[in-house]
Amino acid sequence: MKYYMIAGEASGDLHGSNLIKEVKKLDAQCEVRCWGGDLMEQAGGRLVKHYKDLAFMGFIEVVRNLRTILTNLKFCREDILAFQPDALILIDYPGFNLRIAKWAKKNGFKVIFYISPVILTLKKSLSPAPIP
């Protein structure tokens, strides 16, 4: 199977790396493409973007980096389309992952929130698929 994982901060990188290790125990031939960090890469994921290139905190910093954020969203969508994963696994990182989830769901990709953002309780249309 092919998995695409997105984690946007250090804690997500840790959780993502543990998930990659467990998935690889069950399916040694699986492919994992990811946005995350060094831990996810060391666990066997093919790192596309490092979370250090994605972290913008605060209103002013987000506004200053809006072009970069929009470019990252576009690149992520294109990369998912090119990779055609069996499942898209999102690890927290709500500002980015909720936008990707909405797009992915509309485009027929299976979306799994491994650690879902708290805001999901308010967004019924983005209800996460449970992990079996």
Positions of PLM-derived features:
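Nucleotide-sugar donor-binding and catalytic loop/hinge architecture
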Residues: 1
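Active-site and donor-binding regions of nucleotide-sugar-utilizing enzymes
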Residues: 4-132
